[in-house]
């Protein structure tokens, strides 16, 4: 990613890397999302990350306190496949022995949610523009 961005922008790779890292470290956890993740974990849910994150971003995220709540991960840059390719969902299901009929996939991109539904996983389209409402709906569905 760094070399592609550098070539595209016509700048040194070190400059691109520093700009990417600056962007990553400005990310903030959305409070309702963090709270929901905590509450789902406390209720006994197994939580997994299935993401198209860059290597730099996943390395940053793995150091964040919220990441301790996750039981496993499948990250596209480490697997060589990306969402919405069905293979990446299969990797998650097989690696962690998940039953698709008991699995929910939450994502902000409708194309990713549709593929999950096609393979038998319960889909939930998360609205990034209204994270609070999405979290409340998930809370009602999963925690009563």
Residue ranges and their predicted role:
Residues 1, 11-12, 39, 63, ...:
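General structural signal for secondary-structure boundaries
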Residues 2-3, 17-21, 58, 135, ...:
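Generic detector of well-ordered alpha-helical segments enriched in charged/polar residues
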Residues 51:
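Conserved phosphate-coupling serine/threonine residues in phosphotransfer and NTP-handling enzymes
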Residues 3, 8-48, 86:
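Short, acidic loop-to-helix structural element flanking the phosphoryl-transfer center
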Residues 26, 55-56:
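Short, catalytically relevant binding-site loops at active-site mouths
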Residues 29-33, 59, 109:
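Amphipathic coiled-coil/heptad-repeat helices and related helical stalk/stem segments
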Residues 54-55, 61-144:
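Asp-based, Mg2+/Mn2+-dependent phosphohydrolase catalytic module
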């Amino acid at each position: 990613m760094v070399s592609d961005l550098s070539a595209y922008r016509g700048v040194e790779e070190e400059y691109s890397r520093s700009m990417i890292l600056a962007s990553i470290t400005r990310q903030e956890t959305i409070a309702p999302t963090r709270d929901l993740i905590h509450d789902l974990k406390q209720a006994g849910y197994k939580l997994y990350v299935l993401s198209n994150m860059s290597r730099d971003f996943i390395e940053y995220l793995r150091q964040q306190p919220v990441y301790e709540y996750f039981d496993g991960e499948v990250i596209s840059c480490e697997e060589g496949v990306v969402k919405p390719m069905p293979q990446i969902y299969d990797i998650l299901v097989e690696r962690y022995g998940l039953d698709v009929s008991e699995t929910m996939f939450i994502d902000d991109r409708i194309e990713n949610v549709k593929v999950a539904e096609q393979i038998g996983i319960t889909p939930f389209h998360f609205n990034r523009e209204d994270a609070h409402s999405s979290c409340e709906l998930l809370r009602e569905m999963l925690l009563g």
